[in-house]
Structure formats: structure tokens, C-alpha cells
Amino acid sequence: MTSTRFHSLSDGRQIAFRHVAGTGPTLVFLPGYMSDMAGSKACAVVDWAAGQGRACLLLDYSGCGESPGRFADGTLSRWRDEVLALIAAYCSGPVVLIGSSMGGWLMLLVALCIPNRVAALVGIAAAPDFTAWGFSDEQQAELAAADQQAIGR
């Protein structure tokens, strides 16, 4: 396993990551909620990649694992942007996005931003939010109104 490095974002955030050089589309593992690149799934992916000579990128979202910051400051869009920054900086060519649990949701958000770079998507017990797709426009409006009322707006 390669050692942890840190990528600096323009706002000063430091994102911990490990990158293994190799061939083929880079495997990019996106951990789940409150998980990190030291977890068993991430380790299994990087070990397989190393054994096959495949490129692999692991990362810890800001506020998780080895990345500094407050977990409470994390959002899906913030973490999506962190993943996109690391892919842009360290992955040449196509990527295979592998998302575990909440990482599956991030996998889809990242794929929407860089569709021409995505060779494949692999969801491991992926937990994307599909609630908007399961409701009519009227039901979504009712839910939004109830949400606004609940938070006092």
C-alpha cells in the first residue's frame, strides 16, 4: 500500500488520499458515510488493483479518516467536488467509480459531472437518494412545504 498523501484544494482544505499507479481505467473507491480509505472494502479494492497492476485511487472526504476538518461541515456536494478535484489531479484517462453505501450516491453525482471519463460504475450496497423519482410533482411540493413548515420558514 502506498503512503497517504494530501491534496490541497483552493479553499485550503487538505484531502488525504492514496494513489497506486497502474494500467487500465483507474479504480476510484468512494467510501460510505463516516467510513474511510482504511476500511475493509477500500483495502480489498486497492489490494486487488495492486495484484492486477491496475491504477487505484482511495480518498478520505474532508472531516473523515485522515483528512482534517469537521465531519459536520461535510455535504454531498462538497465531497463530490473533492472527488472531482482528485480525479482531475491524479487520474489520467477513464475511471471506474466504485461507491460503497453513501459512496454510491457520490459515485452517481461524480459520474454526472464527468460522463466522458467514466468507464464503469460499481455500486456496493449503494445508497443513493431516489426519493424525488418516487413522488409526483404534487407530492414533492407537499413534502417541500411540510419541510419548510417544520424548520419554521
Predicted features by range, described:
Residues 33-46:
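The serine-hydrolase catalytic nucleophile loop
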Residues 65-90:
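Catalytic nucleophile-loop/oxyanion-hole region of alpha/beta-hydrolase
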